[in-house]
């Protein structure tokens, strides 16, 4: 594993930071256009469909840079969810027809994706779902309700996971379907009011006798578990890099503040207690980056990244919460004001402990794979 970026990787990170900075105080739609122009919303789309064709490590580096530059955590999360839980399954498993129709639109910034997995009765047991897809000739009829669907209300397409064979259960009994807003009559509930990630839309998705062609199956019949787990490995890996980008911004803000802030005739940075806090912030940020990059490299090498991705997500989400609170302390009363934005990051960071799998559930997964 190398520890120095190539020239291309350095350029990707720099472009990500610059794109993030450009998004300051802009609307969701304006931010999406900027991210699309930089190839961020379609990073993994192959060149044959007009995309950048980035691999996992390049995608992680790009998103890390964007997260460092962009102060809108909700938008960064929505873009990442679109990319990792939505686009990864399409690029890896969709039919040639779907790829030819949809991927160029994603590259152009004209198509947003969402994922519909979670249900109210299943909680962290995502595959205890009740949503069904009943075969009807060349079509399937979907019925059920999905909750906590990021981007669903603004999405042009949604990946829906449903039970197609209850007897087969976890492996072989769940299938992923691609529903298109223009073709399929699913409906979205009212926006969920959240404590953080305010720019990221969240809602329920209602499926009532929604008819979808078998051609819209992503992967193979009954392969929904594998499709979903692969996307979660990507999501946990790249969102760990996303967390690291936000942490880098917090570290740099805090360092600049304690260098400039005087206590009497001495800058705050000269006090040992402040130095300890700052050093710990940078230590945890560097550790997060290394874990995220390691997992991304494993994806690119075709290795089993399940445990590494879970480790990166658990560590980075908890470190993000710690560092955000440390940044507030180092900024003193200023850190508690809205102008500095640290309180908003603290609120956003709470969600990181839950999305992509709650950390305690991921700890169980990690423990089950100890050698």
Enumerate the predicted regions with their spans.
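A short, Trp-centered hydrophobic/proline-enriched beta-strand micro-motif
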Residues: 109-118
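Well-ordered alpha-helical segments within folded domains of soluble proteins
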Residues: 82-87
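A short, charged helix-loop
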Residues: 203-230
């Amino acid at each position: 594993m190398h520890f120095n970026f190539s020239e291309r990787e350095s350029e990707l990170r720099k472009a990500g930071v610059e794109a993030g900075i450009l998004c300051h105080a802009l609307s969701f739609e304006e931010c999406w256009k900027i991210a699309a122009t930089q190839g961020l919303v379609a990073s993994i789309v192959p060149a044959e469909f007009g995309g950048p064709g980035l691999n996992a490590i390049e995608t992680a580096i790009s998103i890390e840079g964007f997260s460092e530059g962009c102060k809108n955590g909700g938008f960064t999360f929505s873009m990442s969810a679109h990319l990792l839980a939505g686009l990864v399954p399409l690029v890896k498993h969709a039919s040639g027809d779907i790829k030819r129709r949809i991927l160029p639109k994603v590259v152009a910034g004209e198509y947003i994706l969402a994922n519909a997995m979670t249900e109210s009765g299943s909680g962290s047991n995502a595959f205890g779902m009740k949503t069904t897809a009943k075969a009807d000739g060349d079509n399937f009829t979907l019925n059920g309700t999905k909750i906590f669907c990021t981007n669903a209300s603004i999405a042009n397409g949604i990946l829906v996971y449903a039970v197609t064979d209850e007897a087969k259960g976890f492996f072989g009994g769940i299938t992923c379907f691609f529903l298109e807003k223009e073709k399929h009559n699913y409906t979205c509930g009212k926006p969920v009011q959240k404590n953080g990630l305010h720019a990221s839309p969240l809602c329920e998705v209602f499926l009532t006798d929604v008819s979808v062609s078998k051609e819209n199956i992503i992967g193979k019949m009954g392969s929904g578990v594998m499709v979903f787990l692969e996307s979660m490995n990507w999501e946990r890996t790249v969102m760990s890099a996303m967390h690291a980008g936000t942490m880098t911004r917090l570290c740099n803000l805090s360092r600049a503040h304690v260098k400039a802030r005087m206590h009497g005739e001495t800058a705050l940075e000269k006090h040992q207690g402040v130095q300890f806090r700052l050093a710990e912030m940078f230590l945890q940020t560097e550790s997060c980056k290394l874990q995220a990059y390691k997992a991304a490299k494993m994806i690119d090498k075709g290795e089993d990244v399940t445990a590494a991705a879970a480790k990166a997500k658990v560590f980075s989400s908890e470190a993000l919460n710690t560092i955000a609170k440390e940044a507030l302390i180092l900024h003193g009363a200023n850190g508690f004001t809205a102008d500095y934005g640290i309180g908003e990051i603290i609120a956003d960071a709470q969600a990181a402990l839950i999305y992509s799998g709650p950390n305690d559930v991921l700890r169980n997964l990690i423990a089950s794979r100890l050698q």
